[in-house]
């Protein structure tokens, strides 16, 4: 009967079961164990996969391995057996598989190129090296060529191609002149990654040198030089400015593939005049700041150690003042195989189960191939104890015959990985690896560890016993580690004795003993005191020591922390140091150091030496004061369920009495390693009862305090754990706030270790709609927040958070009120526009019907217009209680369009729009009334701080700013960008409780009640801008200025307190920026975002019009025309006779209003003004013309001096009567100037 195959879930279950098994056996590094145990071979050293060698040296291909017995080696070349014995040039090193190919007797290294693989074999298996590809380095010569001079126009782009000869490895390229001077590279001239030299625009100075491409080859250490290029630059009178264009890469898009772990290099080189600047961006995200860096004057972007998240679209932006272009590079990240779980050597005992796992990833997904002893697993003899499940080999009930070396080969199109892992089956009884019957001496109250290293297969079980009896030592004051070491946390006298460790497995047992002796600590109980002595007297410093009598005591002295030389004037005894005939050089600090081979203790005193005339009247005043020494020998007694007594020995007060002792504690569950203050006690006590919280593993230390400062903390006490209990409190600072319009986030401050009272602290969160009597919703949370979803907009909720641990629940929690998320408000109701007179427009409105949150104010946008002519948009922000506003009109004929919207924390809602009434003297517009214009940047630099609806105006219309008169009026001496903000109200405005209505008319708002930033003013130039603002923060507050250019590059500038105004100095001419100011301590408090534009920079490339040929020719033509007209006039004047007046008479008057072209909105009373063209003298007469026979005297509108055919009626007189020029005609001259009227 054929064997039925198990379903797939059986294999999965088996793998999960094996994962739960203990780890494999590790062989210790003990040489005796290593030499005794048998072991399959393991590759320990090999050459790299791509092995490039120097043809001038002998070839060395490394392969070394270990095993017991020692392995033998053989090689394959190009997958075929490589017979070393047949080639006299090839030899193998002794006790190694390393190949040496010797060319001293001749031969060509190229003949040995190929793919090599090493095999290490003993009777337990065969291990394989990587497939090593051997290549010989090549450095070919540059082909001979004659290069003609390169002719290029000044300002044009140029590429000098290098085209180096192919080498192995690729050579390093650099450019130099024929005189071996390096070519200076900058933003305009630079070398690309391909080795070519790029000129963004050629200048005349580029002819001063030649250009030679050089290739440096690594292995041969040689440099090949290409014939140099010479440039011939054709000059012009002026170099035309050009928009950027890409020299490399070509086109608007390209793609690039890179392997994971490699470096990604993107390059963009552009031409243009002026030289373009290059900026880099990633579509849909930011550049990785930790891996990205810019090279080659920003023309190259390098991203190191590429990973899959670095794939995507990158684009470079090349820009100068003439314009900008961009090139998009689509980056695809592939991956050669890399290890997720590399197979490890497996050492098992007979009958044990185990597994080999080989998991790798890559792009595309790599395939896995198993081999055993170098042969495919499919062709190996069947083994019933072995099963292959994809990337895992499962071994069950292994036996000695199961020993082998397995290879996992995982590969894709980009590379491969090969790993060896052997399976060794050992049956070894337990063995002790440390010396027997060790003696360990320790000091009382210290921590110590007793080691007992062991080995066996199967892995033995280790137990500890004391004095040969009793139960296994583990728990309480003892802790046994996995390696067999026994730790005693705090040594006491009763811990002295003989400790036995016993290792046991199915093959037997082994034991070892360790004798522990506990010694008393060394203590100085009579310390030397600070002394003041006169010169020439005798001084004695005491130092009496208590120590363990079984230990040898050594007492030594230090002066100023250096070993003291005991001379003839000094006498050292067991318990003192005497100094005879004290001199000034004896002044300083003296340290008594008492030490044994296990510990030591120190005590310090200061000796002050006075001159003969000095008298130590105030001894303490002469002694230096210092911080106290640390307390020592902490001891816990009177252990109770909720209290413990802590006792300590005070340290030296260093001439300043100890005023306080601070007791600190540390717990190892919530914040291990962090010390907290527990209590404070007077300096006169050295013992105190500490009240404790349930379920805390306490450890204490003590700090002494005097008037100089605090001592170093004492060494920590032993730990003491209290029993658990239900919590006695609940978390604080419970809040409910919406982060979106349809949710509510419930947060609280989590409880600390001293309030948890038990294990598994958690929180029961309850919520329901306020005043609905609904059933409470509840959930158990382990963190400090919970988000309730699918909530209505801005609805109040009742919230409760209760603490709970494994011992029970905390007290009933208090109910707090939270709100779900806000949304945009509806439009203000009953928006009304009234015009009581021609100078004032009054606005009134009611609060929105649906605030959808807390109203923080209103935003009014309004713009004046006259027909299709549009003025500048104005923006006003109001407090949430304001419902009236007045606008003072700039002129009596302009109308206004208003847009009013309410604001919540989310933003501005739907707007209510109205228009002012039509003035009585305004002409009916031919087009639809204009809507609010978008915020635009004018040439003056005055910019609105908020957006508005775009205006659809005809192309003939000219937008003219009309600024209404507003009270109070603010006149700025510089053109600036200003914004206003309004503080948020703390309560919601509703129709049930109408707020107090206020009226205001303003441009710049006054400071709000809450902390805010307003009146941000920007004074821009071409490359810098000055920023000022107003705020109502406390003095000393720091701010941050954040601005973003039109390329979406964001920068921030920290501003110290009282540092206004500040200057932004890294701006670009003619670029638009958005800017805001916010508090450094609270980014949520920010000014309104404003927009401004820097002015266009002046460049020296601007052409002088007076030097242009076309202008000179035009001037010459005008001069010639004027000369011809003068000659004609002279001829006509000299001829006399009849004048051809018909042409003059038929010319119609064509008045043109310069104000109409100018687009002015000025109005004038033409009936009450003198005609602009008249030039009346003081006596009311028109002045005599320069020529008596001028044609003006015979123009239309005068008395009839011509007949119907245009001939003269009378003779042409030399002088006309003065009276003919007087009368009513003088006020109605027919000059064309008089026909010009202002068109309102």
Swiss-Prot record:
PROSITE patterns: FN3, IG_LIKE. Residues 630-725, 727-823, 827-922, 1007-1099 form the Fibronectin type-III domain. One of its GO terms (cellular component) is dendrite. The modification Phosphoserine is found at residues 485, 1160, 1174, 1187, 1190, 1226-1227, 1231. The modification Phosphotyrosine is found at residue 481. The keyword Methyltransferase does not apply. Isoform 1 is expressed at Nodes of Ranvier while isoform 2/isoform 3 is expressed in unmyelinated axons. It comes from the Eukaryota. Isoform 2/isoform 3 is phosphorylated at P12. Dephosphorylation is required for ankyrin binding. One of its GO terms (molecular function) is protein domain specific binding. Glycans are attached at residues 305, 409, 446, 483, 752, 778, 866, 881, 1015, 1026, 1047, 1101. The keyword Oxidoreductase does not apply. Keywords: Cell adhesion, Cell membrane, Disulfide bond, Glycoprotein, Immunoglobulin domain, Membrane, Phosphoprotein, Repeat, Signal, Transmembrane, Transmembrane helix. Residues 1154-1165 have a biased composition (Acidic residues). Residues 710-740, 902-942, 982-1002, 1141-1240 are annotated as: Disordered. It is found in: Cell membrane. One of its GO terms (biological process) is protein localization to plasma membrane. Residues 25-1110 are extracellular. It holds the Pfam family fn3. Residues 1132-1240 are cytoplasmic. Residues 1-24 form the signal peptide. Residues 917-933 have a biased composition (Pro residues). Horseshoe-shaped homodimer. Probable constituent of a NFASC/NRCAM/ankyrin G complex. Associates with the sodium channel beta-1 (SCN1B) and beta-3 (SCN3B) subunits. Associates to subunit beta-1 in developing axons as early as postanatal day 5, during the period that nodes of Ranvier are forming. Isoform 2/isoform 3 is likely to interact with axonal proteins in close association with CNTNAP1. Interacts with GLDN/gliomedin. Interacts with MYOC. Homophilic adhesion is primarily mediated by the interaction of the second Ig-like domains. Belongs to the immunoglobulin superfamily. L1/neurofascin/NgCAM family. This is Neurofascin. The gene is Nfasc.
């Amino acid at each position: 009967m054929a064997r039925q195959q198990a379903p797939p879930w059986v294999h999965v279950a088996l793998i999960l079961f094996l994962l739960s098994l203990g780890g494999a056996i590790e062989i210790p590094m003990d040489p005796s164990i290593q030499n005794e145990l048998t072991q399959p071979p393991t590759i320990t050293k090999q050459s790299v996969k791509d092995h490039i060698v120097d043809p001038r040296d002998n070839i060395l291909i490394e392969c070394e391995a270990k095993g017991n017995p020692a392995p033998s080696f053989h090689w394959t070349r190009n997958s075929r057996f490589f017979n070393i014995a047949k080639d006299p040039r090839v030899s193998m090193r002794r006790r190694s598989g390393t190949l040496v190919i010797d060319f001293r007797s001749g031969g060509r290294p190229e003949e040995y190129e190929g793919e090599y693989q090493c095999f290490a074999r003993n009777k337990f298996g065969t291990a394989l090296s990587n497939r090593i590809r051997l290549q010989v380095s090549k450095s070919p010569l540059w082909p001979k060529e004659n290069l003609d001079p390169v002719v290029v126009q000044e300002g044009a782009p140029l590429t000098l191609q290098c085209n180096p000869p192919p080498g192995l490895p690729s050579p390093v390229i650099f450019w130099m002149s024929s005189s071996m001077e390096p070519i200076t590279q900058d933003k305009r001239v630079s070398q690309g990654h391909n080795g070519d030299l790029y000129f963004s625009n050629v200048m005349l100075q580029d002819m001063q040198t030649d250009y030679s491409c050089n290739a440096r080859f690594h292995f041969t250490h040689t440099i090949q030089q290409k014939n140099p290029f010479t440039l011939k630059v054709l000059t012009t009178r002026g170099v035309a400015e050009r928009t950027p264009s890409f020299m490399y890469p070509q086109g608007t898009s390209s793609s690039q593939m890179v392997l994971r772990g490699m470096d990604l290099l993107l390059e963009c080189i552009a031409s243009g005049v002026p030289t373009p600047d290059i900026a880099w961006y990633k579509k849909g995200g930011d550049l990785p700041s930790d891996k990205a860096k810019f090279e080659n004057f920003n023309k190259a972007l390098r991203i190191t150690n590429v990973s899959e998240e670095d794939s995507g679209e990158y684009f470079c932006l090349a820009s100068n003042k003439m314009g900008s272009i961009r090139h998009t590079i689509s980056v695809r990240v592939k991956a050669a195989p890399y290890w997720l779980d590399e197979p490890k050597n497996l050492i098992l005992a007979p009958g044990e189960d185990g597994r080999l796992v080989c998991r790798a990833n890559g792009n595309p997904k790599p395939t896995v191939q198993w081999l055993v002893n170098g042969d495919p697993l499919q062709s190996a003899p069947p083994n019933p104890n072995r099963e292959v499940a994809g990337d895992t080999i499962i071994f069950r009930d292994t036996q000695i015959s199961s020993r082998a070396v397995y290879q996992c080969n995982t590969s894709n199109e980009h590379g491969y990985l090969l790993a060896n892992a052997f399976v060794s089956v050992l049956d070894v009884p337990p063995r002790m690896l440390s010396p027997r019957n060790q003696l360990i001496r320790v000091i009382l109250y210290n921590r110590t560890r007793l080691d007992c290293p062991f080995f066996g297969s199967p892995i033995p079980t280790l137990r500890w016993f004391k004095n040969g009896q009793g139960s296994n030592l583990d728990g309480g004051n003892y802790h046994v580690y996995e390696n067999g070491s026994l730790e005693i946390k705090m040594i006491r006298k009763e811990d002295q004795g003989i400790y036995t460790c016993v290792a046991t497995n199915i093959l037997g047992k082994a034991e070892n003993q360790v004798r522990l002796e506990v010694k008393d600590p060394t203590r100085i109980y009579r310390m030397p005191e600070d002394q003041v002595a006169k010169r020439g007297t005798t001084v004695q410093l005491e130092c009496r020591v208590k120590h363990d009598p079984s230990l040898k005591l050594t007492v030594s002295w230090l002066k100023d922390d250096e070993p003291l030389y005991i001379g003839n004037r000094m006498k050292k005894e067991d318990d003192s140091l005497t100094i005879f005939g004290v001199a000034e050089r004896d002044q300083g600090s003296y340290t008594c150091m008492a030490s044994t081979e296990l510990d030591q203790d120190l005590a310090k005193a200061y000796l002050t030496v006075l001159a003969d005339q000095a008298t130590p009247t105030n001894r303490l005043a002469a002694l230096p004061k210092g911080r106290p020494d640390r307390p020592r020998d902490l001891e816990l007694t009177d252990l109770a369920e909720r209290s413990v007594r802590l006792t300590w020995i005070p340290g030296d007060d260093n001439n300043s009495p100890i005023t306080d002792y601070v007791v600190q504690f540390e717990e190892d569950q919530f914040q291990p390693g962090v010390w907290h203050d527990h209590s404070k006690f007077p300096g006169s006590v050295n013992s105190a009862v500490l009240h404790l919280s349930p379920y805390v593993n306490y450890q204490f230390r003590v700090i002494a305090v005097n008037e100089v400062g605090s001592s170093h903390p004492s060494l920590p006490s032993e730990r003491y754990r209290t029993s658990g209990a239900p919590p006695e409190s609940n978390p604080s600072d419970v809040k409910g706030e919406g982060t979106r319009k349809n949710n509510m986030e419930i947060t609280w401050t989590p409880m600390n270790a001293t309030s948890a009272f038990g294990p598994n602290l958690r929180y029961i969160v309850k919520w329901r709609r306020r005043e609905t009597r609904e059933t409470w919703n509840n959930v158990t949370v382990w963190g400090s927040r919970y988000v309730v979803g699918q909530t209505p907009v801005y609805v109040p909720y009742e919230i409760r958070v209760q603490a709970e641990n494994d011992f029970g629940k905390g007290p009933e929690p208090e109910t707090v009120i939270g709100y779900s998320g806000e949304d945009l408000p509806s439009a203000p109701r009953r928006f009304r526009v009234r015009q009581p007179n021609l100078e004032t427009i009054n606005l009134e409105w009611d609060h929105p019907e649906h605030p959808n949150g807390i109203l923080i104010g209103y935003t009014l946008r309004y713009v004046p217009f006259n027909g299709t002519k549009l003025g500048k948009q104005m923006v006003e922000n109001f407090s949430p209680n304001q419902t009236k506003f007045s606008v003072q009109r700039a002129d009596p004929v302009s109308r206004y369009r208003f847009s009013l919207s309410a604001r919540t924390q989310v933003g501005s809602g739907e707007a209510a729009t109205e228009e002012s009434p039509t003035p009585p003297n305004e002409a009916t517009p031919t087009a639809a009334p204009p809507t609010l214009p978008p915020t635009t940047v004018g040439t003056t630099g005055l910019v609105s701080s908020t957006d508005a609806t775009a205006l659809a105006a005809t192309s003939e219309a000219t937008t003219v700013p009309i600024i209404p008169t507003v009270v109070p009026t603010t006149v700025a001496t510089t053109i600036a960008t200003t914004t206003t903000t309004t503080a948020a109200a703390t309560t919601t405005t509703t129709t049930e409780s109408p707020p107090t209505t206020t009226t205001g008319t303003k441009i710049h708002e006054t400071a709000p009640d809450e902390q805010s930033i307003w009146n941000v003013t920007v004074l821009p130039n071409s490359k810098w801008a000055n920023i000022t603002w107003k705020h109502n923060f406390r003095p000393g507050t720091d701010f941050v200025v954040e601005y973003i250019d039109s390329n979406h590059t964001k920068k921030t500038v920290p501003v110290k307190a009282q540092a206004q105004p500040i200057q932004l100095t890294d701006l670009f001419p003619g670029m638009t920026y958005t800017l805001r100011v916010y508090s450094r301590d609270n980014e949520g408090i920010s000014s309104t975002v404003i927009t401004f534009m820097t002015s266009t920079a002046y460049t020296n490339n601007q052409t002088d019009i007076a030097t242009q040929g076309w202008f000179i020719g035009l001037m010459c033509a005008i001069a010639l025309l004027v000369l011809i007209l003068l000659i004609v006039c002279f001829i006509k004047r000299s001829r006399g006779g009849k004048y051809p007046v018909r042409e003059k008479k038929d010319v119609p008057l064509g008045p043109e209003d310069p104000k109409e072209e100018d687009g002015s909105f000025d109005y004038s009373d033409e009936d009450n003004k003198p005609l602009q063209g008249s030039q009346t003298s003081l006596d009311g007469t028109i002045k005599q013309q320069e020529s008596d026979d001028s044609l003006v005297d015979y123009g239309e509108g005068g008395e009839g001096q011509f007949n119907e055919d245009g001939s003269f009626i009378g003779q042409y007189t030399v002088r006309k009567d003065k009276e003919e020029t007087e009368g009513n005609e003088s006020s109605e001259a027919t000059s064309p100037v008089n026909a010009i009227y202002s068109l309102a």
